[in-house]
């Protein structure tokens, strides 16, 4: 009898939550939230990201002013140790999730590549 795919997915969810990189991300996020300056800067960064994504999804042009504002916020973020560590932890976790995604998508990749000969 085959495993319930949703049970496997929930197992993967738990494994990610227990993973060292996720725990480091969680700790880093708590430090950002615990420091008023870091929290304000991080919130500004997230809002800016969302605004730019929304513009892109709506087909609106990203203006020079948008780019300048984004670069200013990024420059400030790179000087903030708490946010810098948070972003590094997020990058490490994204690599893990990317690897997992490749593994999950392998059956589809093999299926489609089998008929390209």
From Swiss-Prot:
S-S bonds: none
A Pfam cross-reference name: Com_YlbF
Listed InterPro entries: Com_YlbF (IPR010368), YheA/YmcA-like_dom_sf (IPR023378)
Record-stated family: Belongs to the UPF0342 family.
Protein name in the entry: UPF0342 protein Bcer98_0695
Source organism of this protein record: Bacillus cytotoxicus (strain DSM 22905 / CIP 110041 / 391-98 / NVH 391-98)
């Amino acid at each position: 009898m085959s495993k319930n795919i949703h049970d496997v997915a929930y197992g993967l969810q738990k494994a990610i939550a227990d993973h060292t990189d996720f725990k480091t991300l969680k700790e880093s996020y708590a430090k950002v939230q615990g420091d008023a300056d870091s929290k304000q800067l991080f919130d500004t960064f997230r809002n800016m990201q969302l605004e730019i994504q929304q513009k892109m999804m709506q087909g609106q042009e990203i203006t020079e002013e948008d780019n300048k504002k984004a670069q200013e916020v990024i420059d400030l973020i790179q000087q903030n140790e708490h946010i810098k560590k948070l972003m590094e932890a997020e990058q490490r976790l994204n690599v893990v999730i990317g690897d997992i995604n490749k593994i999950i998508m392998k059956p589809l990749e093999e299926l489609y590549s089998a008929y390209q000969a």
